[in-house]
């Protein structure tokens, strides 16, 4: 039913309703009445008709008058079931007022107009031109930027210091391998990369017949303790190197006599396989020049067993040699002939304060060999501890020297705290405790803690700074009592290490194209004289007696 039919029906209904009272009027009018009453009756009828029409216009509510704040009558009528009618013309006007956008066909027609086509092409051209411009700029930046140097090939023993424990009983209160295992966490705090243990095998002095490489001396511990030590060290990121020097307690030499070298090396080869299968990460041998020259074929086999990886042992193992030679030329020749991964020598002569000799030896070895094969140490099983060799006042100076030279530093146990030899080369290790101490002992304890803190700071910086790990070595200044060198790597910060061995102050005048005028103090053996983070003049660098300092300055291109 359409709208017009609905309107007609409603109009017919209203006509019938209005006709009923109209039909009653003639009946009343037919009765005789006075003229005045007739006029009154007609007025009443007119008022009644008007009232009825007004009531029909009001909504069907429960009665009563509509309050003033009530909604409009039309809204109430819709709520009470009344129908609000709209003619077609009004609907068309409302639809025209509500714009809902273009449909698909209209959009396609508009998009195909010349104006929009030109706009799209212009925006597309701008986009691709911008993209190509950014690409070209990126390529130009890459081409013009300085290339980073490729990192050198290094091994785990080049990443930090090696820590030697030559006497297990002297290192801890437990006096065995279990006690050493309990101190691994303390060694980890020093950022050492390797732990050199022993010798711990059975080897009565000068008795080649009683030699047993594969048996642990009862004084050192047992196989289970050694297994626990290796596992704990590996968890802390520390590799374990085993000292297998044959005659380490005798006086006839580390390899006994020349006639017994062949017999000893044959037994050593089987022992190497045994210990490498136990998880050790390398082997140290003293007197390598003797075995390499007397039985070169046997020495080649030893090298192959340790240095060549297998499916069972894919990780790289280190072969460390030890020699008593001190001449830089002899050490360089031996390093080439033996083929060891590291060679510990006496190039840095104990007690020598000749800075010019130190500089010459370091420069010769550095120029002849890769720094990944160089090792620097002072003291050891045969020589004793650093503090006894150079004096307590120079311990920090030599710590700085060992940890900043190009190569691997090798530290004897206790050197980090300035431990002194007491009647023998294996003094008892001193560990910090909370027990009450008198004045003198308190001062000694404070000095040990200061020395250890200095070593730890140096070691931490060495393992994370590329110039100190594998950077180039440049000699800046050297005299009979002072030395300064530069460590640089690519675009990293530059480090200057300066030393004064003299008993009086020295002034170093460091200048050159690679040096700025100012540098920042990183560490100093005398922090009150050269505090950390202070600025110094490199052209007028003053060092006190026995003082050393590590400085840095930024890369400037």
Model-found features: residue ranges?
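Substrate-binding cleft of carbohydrate-active enzyme catalytic domains
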Residues: 188-192, 215-253, 263-264, 271-276, ...
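Active-site neighborhood of glycoside hydrolase catalytic domains
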Residues: 263-329
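Aromatic-lined carbohydrate-binding surfaces of glycoside hydrolases
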Residues: 200-206, 244-257
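The substrate-binding groove and active-site-proximal loops of carbohydrate-active enzymes
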Residues: 164-175, 209-223, 254-266, 281-296, ...
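Carbohydrate-interacting/catalytic domains
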Residues: 1-196, 202, 214, 219, ...
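Conserved alpha/beta catalytic core and glycan-binding cleft of carbohydrate-active enzymes
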Residues: 255-257, 303-434, 489, 497, ...
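Short, acidic/polar
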Residues: 174-188, 260-277, 392-401
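A structural motif
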Residues: 189-192, 277-281, 288, 340, ...
